[in-house]
UniProtKB/Swiss-Prot annotation:
Part of the 50S ribosomal subunit. Residues 60-71 have a biased composition (Basic residues). This is Large ribosomal subunit protein uL4. It comes from Bacillus pumilus (strain SAFR-032). The gene is rplD. GO terms for biological process: translation. Belongs to the universal ribosomal protein uL4 family. GO terms for molecular function: rRNA binding; structural constituent of ribosome. PANTHER family: 50S RIBOSOMAL PROTEIN L4, LARGE RIBOSOMAL SUBUNIT PROTEIN UL4M. One of the primary rRNA binding proteins, this protein initially binds near the 5'-end of the 23S rRNA. It is important during the early stages of 50S assembly. It makes multiple contacts with different domains of the 23S rRNA in the assembled 50S subunit and ribosome. Forms part of the polypeptide exit tunnel.
Amino acid sequence: MPKVALFNQNGSTNGEIELNASVFGIEPNESVVFDAILMQRASLRQGTHKVKTRSEVRGGGRKPWRQKGTGRARQGSIRSPQWRGGGIVFGPTPRSYSYKLPKKVRRLAIKSVLSSKVIDNNIIVLEDLTLDAVKTKEFAGILKGLSVEKKALIVTADANETVALSARNIPGVTVVEANGINVLDVVNHEKLLITKAAVEKVEEGLA
């Protein structure tokens, strides 16, 4: 089982914690992680693109000139696709880009990125994370004490509004609950700060 240092929020170590090898100690599968990221990014797309077909653009109900005798090419409507202002053929329509990977694949992907954080020594396990009031300056001091200078994902066991509001204005810092941890968030942040209670919750859900 992988062991990592257990920190308190003042930045000092308080022993070690053993992580579940089936969640934090597997061989990362980059291909599965890539597929999971594509799935998440696809589901984030709005898909509200829309153009009008010849049946939707205004006008064009009357034949612009008679069929024969004018010397011009025959036309049936001024809203045919070849006309300026005409309808679009096979243009984009509103659609959902989201799709689902199999549950086992999604679980393998999140285990892979969590294991990568352990391998790269980019995981910090906190004994607890509590603030008496919403204080961005105080929270920034906690991060500094833990030597977190780049993008960080904070994972708490349950919803913690005080922590979430304190971290909201710090660039590159995101707070999520343990049951909302996902591949894209973990990959997009260099450091993973997770409380001991959140570790237990993640292990319970993935082991």
